[in-house]
Amino acid sequence: GGLAGNAGLFSTARDVARVYQMLLNGGEIDGQRYLSKETCQLFTTETSKISRRGLGFDKPDADDPKKGNCAPAAPAGVYGHTGFTGTCAWVDPVNELVYVFLSNRIYPDVTNRKLNQLHIRERIQGAIYDAMKKK
């Protein structure tokens, strides 16, 4: 037992988006600095040849975009996080985009795998990129 900073934190999509917007802004939002630009860069840069992850966030798979947790249309610089309950949040610095998807994939119970099997998070993110292309 004990307390952990995962699988049990609750927030609104708006507040999650503000945290990710702060990261996109290099650690600052509304004129207030929370993290240095260097820290944001460290958290979001791939740091290993054997993992696609940064120190704090997931990244697309450079060798096979279909293997990662984001849409194949997402540019290489995106970073984000997927959660056990089906949530995800991604930052796209190239397009200055923050994408937040909050869900409860474990309803009615933990064996519900439809959200993952149907690639819902990636498909929604892909639809966003498709809409941006049409603009």
Model region roles, listed by residue range:
Residues 1-135:
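Catalytic loop of the DD-peptidase/beta-lactamase superfamily, centered on the K-T-G motif
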